[in-house]
Amino acid sequence: YEILRCLVGSEMCIRDSAGAVDSVRIRGGKIHVHVIGNSSGKISPKGICGSGIVDLIAELFLEGWIDIRGKFSPEKTNLIQKREGQLCIEYAPGLYFYQKDIDEFILTKAAAHIMVEIMLRESGLELNQADRFYVAGSFGKYVSVESAITIGMYPDMEREKMINAGNSSLEGAQKLLLNKELLADIDQILEEMTYIQFAEVDDFLEQMVAAQALPHTDYKKYPTVMEKLKKRQNICFY
């Protein structure tokens, strides 16, 4: 998920540093943001980072400001406007998230979704048979699990099974440097590993298209998201 730390193509996307919007909520028709390093209230938002993007798209979807394809519904709010020939939303003063940004992000979240789905299928497992769902990398440390599930980036499963592994590659390298006996564990892991070449999966493109809907074309995979939609809007998109 490191690719999601900063969405390629978004003019306003920045790294998770001071001034970055890292959390978004929509309440009462207004967008509320949290800005990194703004405990004093003196730092203005400069852009949005990966976790903020996940929140923003999830909230736009739950409010009905974007549809299941991620397309803006300008009739729902005057915060959606047209700039430079395309629709966008002003999520903070002078900061805009464009339709092209949403479109590009949806491709990324779809790829993340089908990686999990195909790995489970090729391993002969159902989602409810998975004991743990580990999210590695610094992005996973800060992203909202609920928002990631809402947009279909993570599977809709028991929240207590979802574990933030942090920077597992760095931590693993440090442990190996301090204890060479762990090399034996690596050999065992390699023997048990299931290797999948996604490009060779017969229905890869079909699965990719299905995962480009919010949260997914098969909405039955996301029962908790459907409940959220009903509570926020008293309707279901499907």
Regions found by a protein language model. Name each.
Residues 1-9, 14:
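Single conserved hydrophobic/aromatic residue that forms the stacking wall/gate
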Residues 10-11, 35-44, 97-101, 151-163:
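Short beta-alpha connecting loops at secondary-structure transitions
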Residues 15-77, 186-199:
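A short helix-loop
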Residues 55-108:
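Gly/charged contiguous loops adjacent to phosphate- or pyrophosphate-bearing nucleotide/cofactor binding elements
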Residues 56-64, 115-122, 133, 142, ...:
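Generic, well-ordered alpha-helical scaffold segments in large soluble proteins
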Residues 106-128:
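Phosphate/ATP-binding catalytic cores across multiple sugar-kinase/actin-like superfamilies
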Residues 125-189:
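Catalytic phosphate/nucleotide-handling subdomain of diverse soluble enzymes
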Residues 175-238:
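Acidic, glycine/GT-rich loop-and beta-edge segments that sit at the periphery of enzyme/chaperone cores
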